[in-house]
Amino acid sequence: LQLTGAGVLTAVIDSGIDYTHRDFRNPDGTTRIHALWDQTAQGMPPEGYDRGALYTKEDINKALAAETAEERKRIVPIEDRNGHGTAVAGIMAGNGSSSGGVNRGVAPGSELLVVKMGMTNERGFPRTTELMLGLDFVIREAIRAGKPVAVNVSFGNSYGAHDGTSLLESYIDTVSQIWKNNIIIAAGNDAVSAGHFRAVMI
């Protein structure tokens, strides 16, 4: 099957993205990123939201065409400081341009939709509210674009009931029924850390 993800949005809700990376650009050098919402930035947030800054495809292309790194950073100042979001985006949708087509992602023909989640500090994790806002944004944006969306959530914490009853779990279950979307949640990131225990209270 020649499935490339063409006509589909690939959403990455994570630590950001290196939007200058060649794997996220078209052969002519323009961006493959449909939109980028940085929840941590000061600027013009997406319509209906009260935080962060939204960068459109046009903004990103303008930044990519800038003559200096300083000018590029002034136009679209987003950074992915720990690289997690960039790595995830590459696995999902990298087109392999930086490796001569060898290392391509699962959907190299898709457009990217990126949310850099807000965090209380650089070494912390986003709150569940940031994740919920990110999910809301990418699904609304997919509806506006008229395209199905595959959403990856693999950056965050392991809080919650883990039985489907928490607010976040209920929210994900609800929004998964809206529009044409698939929400993929990482599991097992804590490995053998034994962060959860089962017990009977007497």
Where do the protein language model's features map onto the residues?
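Substrate-binding/access-modulating region of protease and related hydrolase catalytic domains
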Residues: 119-201
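Subtilisin-like serine protease catalytic core
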Residues: 2-129, 146-148, 164, 179-180, ...
